[in-house]
């Protein structure tokens, strides 16, 4: 079999394959023989159908098409093997199948073209001496006070209040019913449109402006128990329920009771109630340590993201469609698993209409992820960065001890750990051989959009899910 190769874009190898006359004839005859054994034709037993009858009943074009399918499949497989091509994914026929049927004659040579994806060639122009900027996340001691105050609020006792009007910080018990406010030009005599789910009885609302839609809380402030009034409010835009987004509303509100919060004292008893610590001092120290580490981890992550973003700029690679589609599949699978774990019906979210849109929107991120991964692999290859079995086993043992009750696939865990350790080593090497300048938090946000990897599509679908469920 004669095979001619050519290099194509998107990391493809083009193949021109010429099949010998002997093979085209032999395959055609074999197809006729096989069909005569399997086709049911009245008046004839299987395997005893005369050749001419078979050709008349099925048609020569049908038989040629069946033979051609075998010739193409076998021809491509043999060509890949003969040329020692490390193909990935499924081969693609470049010639027109219909044209091949018309030109195919058993006993004559058959020439057709196909293409296969191969692993891409990576040209890493630079990977040492990279320069980037990353935001430094500094620990703020005020976070400890904020967390403790939040815990106090959650443990607050509600005390009924008499003799005064509602004020910010109170908890109001109200009945309310909401309608869409009429716009200019609406029929004045028409019944106002009720807001779906916009009514409640004995509803407790904390009088903080961010607890409800804008205008609702401020409308209650100043009311006395027993008062009823109309409160104007405005649904934000965007809003979970897009049909209500940006619309003005009127709520008829009756204030039934006012309560104020009595907060527990910040002392050792409080610490024991909200944590496993015996003293408030120990609780504060633990929180401070946690948020200090969190700030350090975020800073390190920012450094890594900045460095990887810079590395990608120096990678020249023509990605094959097979790898891109595989990465998109992985991203959507991760998203589906995350949504399923949240209790959402993935089958209702991933409809036949939305999947193609999600795939298209996921492509840029898939390409970015692939470039990062291939870039790291190339650095490891050039610098001989590896992980030892001892390092892998140590991390596996650590993880197993952390999750003793989990049913863990040991082989899969080892693979994941090996990949993680290798990535960590490569990134540490890059950090040691590059310069990442730390700049104040927020100073880069407006300059360059942050590249978030797996979560982007998840967040997109989660918004759609919330709209669907009305949550």
From Swiss-Prot:
Family, per entry: Belongs to the FKBP-type PPIase family. Tig subfamily.
Gene Ontology cellular-component annotations: cytoplasm
Organism name: Nostoc sp. (strain PCC 7120 / SAG 25.82 / UTEX 2576)
Free-text note on domains in this protein's UniProt record: Consists of 3 domains; the N-terminus binds the ribosome, the middle domain has PPIase activity, while the C-terminus has intrinsic chaperone activity on its own.
Compartment(s) of residence: Cytoplasm
Gene3D superfamilies named among the record's database cross-references: 3.10.50.40, Trigger factor ribosome-binding domain, Trigger factor, C-terminal domain
Molecular function in Gene Ontology: peptidyl-prolyl cis-trans isomerase activity; protein folding chaperone; ribosome binding
Catalytic activity: [protein]-peptidylproline (omega=180) = [protein]-peptidylproline (omega=0)
The entry's keywords: Cell cycle, Cell division, Chaperone, Cytoplasm, Isomerase, Rotamase
EC number of the protein: 5.2.1.8
Gene for this chain: tig
Lineage: Bacteria, Bacillati, Cyanobacteriota, Cyanophyceae, Nostocales
Main location: cytoplasm
Biological processes per GO annotation: 'de novo' cotranslational protein folding; cell division; chaperone-mediated protein folding; protein transport; protein unfolding
Protein name: Trigger factor
Pfam family, one: Trigger_N
Cystine pairings recorded for this chain: none
Function: Involved in protein export. Acts as a chaperone by maintaining the newly synthesized protein in an open conformation. Functions as a peptidyl-prolyl cis-trans isomerase.
Residues of the PPIase FKBP-type domain: 169-264
Coiled-coil positions: none
């Amino acid at each position: 079999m004669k095979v001619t190769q050519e290099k194509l874009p998107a990391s493809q190898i083009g193949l021109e394959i010429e099949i010998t006359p002997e093979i085209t004839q032999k395959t055609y005859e074999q197809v006729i023989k096989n069909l005569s054994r399997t086709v049911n034709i009245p008046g004839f037993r299987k395997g005893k159908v005369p050749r001419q009858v078979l050709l008349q009943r099925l048609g020569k074009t049908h038989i040629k098409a069946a033979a051609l399918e075998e010739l193409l499949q076998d021809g491509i497989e043999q060509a890949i093997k003969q040329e020692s091509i490390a193909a990935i994914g499924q081969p693609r026929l470049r010639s027109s199948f219909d044209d091949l049927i018309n030109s195919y004659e058993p006993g004559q040579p058959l020439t057709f073209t196909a293409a296969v994806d191969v692993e891409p060639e990576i040209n890493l122009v630079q990977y040492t001496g990279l320069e980037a900027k990353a935001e430094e996340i500094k620990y703020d001691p005020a976070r400890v006070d904020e967390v403790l105050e939040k815990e106090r609020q959650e443990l607050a006792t509600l005390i009924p209040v008499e003799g005064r009007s509602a004020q910010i910080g109170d908890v109001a018990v109200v009945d309310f019913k909401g309608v869409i406010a009429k716009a200019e030009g609406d029929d004045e005599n028409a019944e106002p449109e009720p807001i779906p789910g916009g009514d409640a009885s004995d509803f407790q609302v904390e009088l903080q402006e961010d607890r409800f839609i804008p205008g609702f809380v401020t409308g209650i402030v100043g009311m006395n128990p027993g008062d009823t009034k109309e409160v104007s409010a405005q649904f934000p835009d965007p809003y979970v329920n897009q049909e209500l987004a940006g619309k003005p509303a009127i709520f008829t509100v009756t204030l039934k009771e006012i309560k104020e919060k009595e907060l527990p004292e910040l002392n050792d008893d409080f610490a024991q109630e909200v944590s496993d610590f015996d003293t408030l001092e120990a609780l504060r120290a633990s929180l401070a340590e946690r948020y200090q580490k969190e700030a350090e981890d975020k800073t390190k992550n920012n450094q890594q993201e900045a460095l990887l973003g810079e590395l990608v700029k120096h990678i020249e690679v023509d990605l094959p469609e097979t790898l891109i589609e595989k990465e998109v599949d992985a991203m959507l699978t991760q998203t589906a698993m995350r949504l399923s774990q949240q209790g959402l019906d993935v089958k209702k979210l991933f409809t036949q209409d939305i999947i193609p849109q999600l795939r298209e929107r996921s492509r840029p991120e898939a390409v970015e992820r692939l470039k990062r991964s291939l870039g790291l692999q190339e650095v490891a290859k050039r610098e001989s960065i590896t992980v030892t079995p001892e390092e892998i086993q140590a991390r596996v043992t650590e993880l197993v001890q952390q999750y003793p009750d989990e049913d863990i696939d040991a082989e899969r865990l080892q693979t994941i750990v090996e990949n993680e350790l290798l990535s960590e080593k490569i990134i540490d090497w890059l950090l040691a051989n590059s310069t990442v300048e730390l700049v104040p938090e927020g100073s880069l946000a407006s300059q360059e959009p942050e590249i978030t990897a797996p979560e982007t599509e998840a967040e997109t679908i989660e918004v759609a899910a919330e709209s669907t469920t009305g949550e």
